[in-house]
Amino acid sequence: MMHLKNITAGNPKTKEQYQLTKQFNIKWLYTEDGKNWYEEQKNFQPDTLKMVYDHNGVIICIEKDVSAINPEGANVVEVPDITANRRADISGKWMFKDGVVIKRTYTEEEQRQQAENEKQSLLQLVRDKTQLWDSQLRLGIISDENKQKLTEWMLYAQKVESTDTSSLPVTFPEQPE
């Protein structure tokens, strides 16, 4: 199985490559050990999956046809076309690590960022949920039931805002009904 690492753009290395670059504006890609990406494609098997992963191991492209891949700035690995590997996708939740395709593991910093993103998303939900009630309150036309809901959601927003996302794991308060 093929595994090409750290593929980057480089200058043409032969007269023919130079002519092709000049004529068709071709970008030449090379692995960290100097192999030409275009020449290496013929060494991939047709019945395998070709996965492109970034410097963190996160899978960013999956193809059966190696010629459909642009691996610039990444790595390409060939894996068997089996159920376990077909479960992977390019959502950012899968990675290639230690020779196998696995569910992604997140660093603490990534987990903190995810928690902060979730916090902002929850606060936006509160704004969306309470916008009409807030307008009704300002106009003095809110029903007692909606006033109670507005209060519950605003108390929830205070709890979300005070949630510390720098300390893992992060637990957010339950949403009002």
UniProtKB/Swiss-Prot annotation:
A Pfam entry, by short name: Caudo_TAP
Domain of life: Viruses
Annotated compartments: Virion; Host cytoplasm
Induction entry: Expressed in the late phase of the viral replicative cycle. Expression of late genes is activated by the viral late transcription activator C. Expressed alternatively with tail fiber assembly protein U. The switch from S-U to S'-U' is performed through inversion of a DNA segment called G by the phage invertase protein Gin.
Keyword Chloroplast found: no
GO biological process, any: symbiont entry into host cell
Keywords of the record: Host cytoplasm, Host-virus interaction, Late protein, Viral attachment to host adhesion receptor, Viral attachment to host cell, Viral receptor tropism switching, Viral release from host cell, Viral tail assembly, Viral tail fiber assembly, Viral tail fiber protein, Viral tail protein, Virion, Virus entry into host cell
GO annotation, cellular component aspect: host cell cytoplasm; virus tail, fiber
Zinc-finger recorded as keyword: no
Membership in a protein family: Belongs to the tfa family.
Miscellaneous field: The orientation of the G segment is defined as G+ and G-. G+ orientation provides S-U fibers whereas G- provides S'-U' fibers. S-U and S'-U' dont have the same host range (e.g. respectively E.coli and C.freundii).
Function: Chaperone involved in tail fiber assembly. Remains associated to the tail fiber and participates in the host receptor binding. Binds to the primary receptor. Two alternate tail fiber assembly proteins U and U' are encoded extending the host range of the virus.
Protein name: Tail fiber assembly protein U'
Lineage: Viruses, Duplodnaviria, Heunggongvirae, Uroviricota, Caudoviricetes
Gene giving rise to this polypeptide: U'
